[in-house]
C-alpha cells in the first residue's frame, strides 16, 4: 500500500480530513487515467503563512497553513469554494505532471505541468464535489483569467506561452481543458492524456513538448471537432454564441432536461 501522511501543527486540524480525502481520491482517480502513483508514500508538510502556496516535489508537498490547514471552509455548503481539497488535488496532479512527464525548456512547457495538473484537479472536483462546487470553481478560474489578462499587453496562444503567464497556464487551462473534455467526451479526452503520458513517461534527450501533446490529443478527437483543438491551443478565439430558444422538460425525479438552440 501507499503510506499517506500529513505533518501539521497540533491545533491546525480543521481541514485534515478533506486534505487526506483529496490525497486518496487523487491517487485512485489519476492512477486510473495516467497510470499508477509511483512512490511508497506521499507526505504533506505544513509551513507558516509567511507565504501562501503549496509546491509538489516527488512524494512530498510543502503546504502553507494559509491555504489549507486554517482555512474556514464549510464542507456542507456547495457555494463555499473547497480550497483545501482543490489545492491538494492540484498538487497531487504534479506527481504525474511534471514528475513523470516533464516538458523541455521551450514555449508551452509550463502548460504541460500546471495546465494538466489544473485540469486534473477540476475533473476530480467535478467528480467528488458535484455541479454546484464545480460551477463555483469554474467561475473562480474565469475571474482569475480575466483579471490576469487585463494586465497583459497581448495574450499569447497556449502553444506560445513563455511560462510566466499564470492566468493562462493555470486559470485558462483549467477552464478550457475541462470544457474540451465535455465536448470531445471525458473518456476520449482522458484516453488521450493516458496515451500521452504512456508515450513520454520519464523521456528525455529530447524532452517532450506541447506540440506532441496536441498531436496525441488530435488522435482521439473526431474530425468534426478538430477545430476545437486549433482554436484552444493555437489561436485566441472568441465565440459569438447566443441562445435562440429554450425548452425544459421536467423529469419524474424533479430534475429537468433543458434543450437550447
Predicted regions and their residues:
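Hydrophobic alpha-helical and helix-loop surface patches within well-folded domains
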Residues: 6-255, 259-260
Amino acid at each position: 500500500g501507499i503510506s499517506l501522511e500529513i505533518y501539521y501543527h497540533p491545533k491546525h486540524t480543521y481541514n485534515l480530513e478533506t486534505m487526506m480525502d483529496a490525497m486518496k481520491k487523487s491517487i485512485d482517480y489519476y492512477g486510473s487515467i495516467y497510470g499508477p502513483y509511483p512512490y511508497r508514500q506521499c507526505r504533506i508538510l505544513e509551513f507558516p503563512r509567511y507565504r501562501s502556496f503549496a509546491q509538489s516535489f516527488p512524494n512530498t508537498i510543502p503546504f502553507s497553513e494559509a491555504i489549507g490547514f486554517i482555512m474556514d471552509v464549510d464542507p456542507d455548503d456547495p457555494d463555499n469554494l473547497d480550497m483545501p481539497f482543490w489545492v491538494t488535488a492540484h498538487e497531487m496532479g504534479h506527481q504525474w505532471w511534471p514528475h513523470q512527464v516533464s516538458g523541455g525548456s521551450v514555449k508551452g512547457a509550463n502548460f504541460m505541468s500546471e495546465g494538466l495538473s489544473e485540469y486534473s484537479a477540476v475533473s476530480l472536483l467535478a467528480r467528488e464535489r458535484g455541479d454546484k462546487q464545480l460551477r463555483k470553481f469554474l467561475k473562480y478560474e474565469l475571474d482569475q483569467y480575466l483579471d490576469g489578462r487585463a494586465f497583459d499587453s497581448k495574450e499569447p496562444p497556449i502553444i506560445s506561452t513563455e511560462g510566466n503567464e499564470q492566468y493562462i497556464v493555470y486559470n485558462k487551462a483549467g477552464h478550457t481543458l475541462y470544457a474540451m473534455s465535455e465536448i470531445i467526451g471525458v473518456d476520449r479526452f482522458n484516453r488521450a492524456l493516458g496515451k500521452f503520458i504512456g508515450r513520454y513517461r520519464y523521456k528525455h534527450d529530447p524532452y517532450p513538448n506541447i506540440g506532441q501533446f496536441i498531436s496525441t490529443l488530435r488522435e482521439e478527437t473526431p474530425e468534426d471537432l478538430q477545430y476545437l483543438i486549433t482554436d484552444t491551443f493555437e489561436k485566441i478565439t472568441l465565440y459569438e454564441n447566443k441562445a435562440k430558444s429554450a425548452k425544459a422538460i421536467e423529469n419524474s425525479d424533479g430534475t429537468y432536461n433543458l434543450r437550447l438552440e
